Amino acid sequence: MLQKGGFMGKTVVKKQEQQAELQPKFVRVCGTVTDMMCGRRTYKNGRKDKEDKFRLSIKPADGEIEKLIDEAAPYYENADANYIPKFLKDDASDDDLEYLNLKSSFEFPFAKLENGAIVEAGIFTNVLEQYGNITGSKVVVTVKLVEGAFYPASVCIVELKSKSLTDFYSDLEFDKLPFA
């Protein structure tokens, strides 16, 4: 952009540099799945989700959350305090740094590591249908950073630990369930 006099002004250059810096960025975070669900949620304050959300919670491996904090901080410099993730806040507790909670309105793709090769496992609901609850599975989550937000872009299951209802209950407890 040329301004009067035929030179590029400092403010224009600064804006272009900021825009170049805040292009979407992808960061990989390794960890263990602690929860995976889809649907609408009702919060403590009574607010409800308007649409189905796809949620994935992981416990990041050592040093992974710090790596994400370093990469994500510039994307939240001008964000409203209500929209800043807990792990990025100055007063973040150890509990806030222990888990990474991801949610999306769109299903994100999964892949699975099999015999040293990455194989497509489908989208979120396919994984739930095929493998059930994958709590305890080792994963690598690719997080997409954009200005003021972060989203799960994809998940690669490195070590699958699939669970069924019988894994949560003993045989005696399972027989007492109303649908058994």
Question: Which role fits each region the language model picked out?
Answer:
Residues 57-59, 142-144, 156:
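Residue-level recognition of well-ordered beta-strand positions that form the cores
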Residues 2-108:
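OB-fold ssDNA-binding interfaces and closely related basic DNA-contact patches used
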Residues 146-167:
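OB-fold/S1-family single-stranded nucleic acid-binding modules
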Residues 102-128:
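Beta-strand/loop nucleic-acid-binding surfaces
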Residues 73, 115-116, 151-156:
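"Short basic amphipathic alpha-helical interaction patches in structured regions
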Residues 118-139, 145-149:
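Exposed beta-sheet edge/beta-hairpin loop segments within beta-rich domains
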Residues 10, 171-180:
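Short acidic DE-rich linear segments
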Residues 53-55, 138-140, 152:
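Broad gene-expression machinery/nucleic-acid interaction feature
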